[in-house]
């Protein structure tokens, strides 16, 4: 488990990421104004209405909904799993490259070696229905680059993605590791036939999702 946040701050980050009708750009604007997420929920509706629409300001000033409380409790339970982490936008472990994109996620759900988020990364992606030669090349390139200290990032899809992860894992503990960026929730492996690969990445690399 990794939760290097006071309970109040953790709950506020969760609510901020789950608040209906609150976009990530609006959430970042609120954070710039308030500093910490729990400070947002200490603001009066009138003050919040200067930053977001009045209806949303009223919701932010009210108590969290039962759905948000339930989701927060589930996430806290999820964090009890081995090497399960939450990395917020304000966390030093948050990937620096993500901070440069237009709409960085407020929170990342992570399973595995969180230190890899700060590693030099090379992304490898390609066809799901790849040729034998393409798969072999992806395995070889990823293996070589991982041996040189690069963390190989891909999407855990069939074909080239899976080959890139496998090639990086072949470099072993002395290699740069591999990072699987998931388009699903952190607890959902898609495609399911890559479940064993996902477990191996969780043990020897890192799985990352914003969901």
Language-model segments: which ranges?
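Glycine-biased, small-residue-rich flexible motifs in mid-sequence functional cores and linkers
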Residues: 2-9, 88-211
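Short, small/acidic-rich helices and loops at N termini and domain boundaries
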Residues: 1-93
């Amino acid at each position: 488990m990794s939760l290097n946040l006071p309970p109040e701050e953790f709950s506020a980050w969760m609510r901020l990421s789950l608040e209906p009708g609150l976009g990530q750009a609006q959430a970042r604007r609120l954070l710039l104004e308030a500093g910490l997420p729990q400070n947002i929920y200490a603001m009066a509706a009138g003050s919040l209405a200067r930053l977001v629409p009045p209806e949303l300001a009223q919701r932010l000033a009210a108590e969290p909904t039962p759905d948000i409380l339930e989701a927060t409790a589930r996430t806290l339970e999820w964090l009890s799993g081995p090497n399960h982490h939450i990395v917020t936008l304000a966390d030093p472990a948050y990937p620096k490259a993500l901070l440069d994109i237009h709409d960085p996620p407020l929170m990342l759900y992570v399973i595995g070696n969180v230190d890899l988020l700060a590693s030099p990364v090379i992304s490898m992606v390609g066809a799901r229905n790849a040729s034998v030669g393409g798969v072999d090349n992806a395995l070889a390139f990823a293996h070589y680059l991982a041996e040189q200290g690069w963390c190989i990032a891909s999407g855990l899809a069939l074909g080239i993605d899976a080959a890139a992860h496998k090639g990086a894992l072949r470099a072993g503990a002395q290699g740069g590791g591999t990072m699987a960026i998931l388009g699903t929730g952190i607890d959902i492996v898609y495609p399911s036939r890559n479940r064993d690969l996902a477990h191996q990445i969780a043990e020897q690399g890192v799985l990352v999702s914003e969901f």
